[in-house]
Amino acid sequence: DIAPAQMVVDACRLADDAIDFSQYDDDNDGVIDNVFVFFAGNDEADGGGEDCIWSHAWAVYSGAGYNVNLDGKRLDRYACTSELSKLVSGDGSSDSLAGIGTFCHEYSHTFGLPDFYDTDYEESGGEAAGLWYWTALMDGGNQNMNGYVPPYFNAIEREILGLCTPVTISKDGTYTLEPIHKNGQAYRIDTDNEDEYYLIECR
């Protein structure tokens, strides 16, 4: 697991005869928009052991420094996740097909969503306790029901992606919210701090 970007390079080179990578540069900037790899075996994050790859999103060129061109397009952004998981057994004793949750989480990074969990595990890497671990796909929600039932995007995730424009509440009143997965509606309440506000949604 020490060179996951090389795995992506090798996989893409093996697939190059069957895939025209030039079709996957939607904005025509000379860079393949994204590659997603499902790798065989287990995920280190799901109990697979330290020799397994930890599912992640990264970059072949701007991250790992490999200058690889396929069909005239540079290979860069990628994400990956595992075929199997040890979470389902409960005690890590057996392998099962991995749920879709971690795929949804890692693929959402390629849309531009950040992690919402404490990424350095020392309460300084972006901890966001207000999101409720299980309700945010980019926090720990990808592990709901062992990864088989990830949550819908929440209000902040939808706002970042441009899928939701929260309505600002500026006066007292009675307000109604439908479940966010039905119409993407959320409310916003500003605070005295310029860069801080609350988002209200119905899950």
Residue ranges, per PLM feature:
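Propeptide (latency) domains of metzincin metalloproteases
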Residues: 12-17, 30
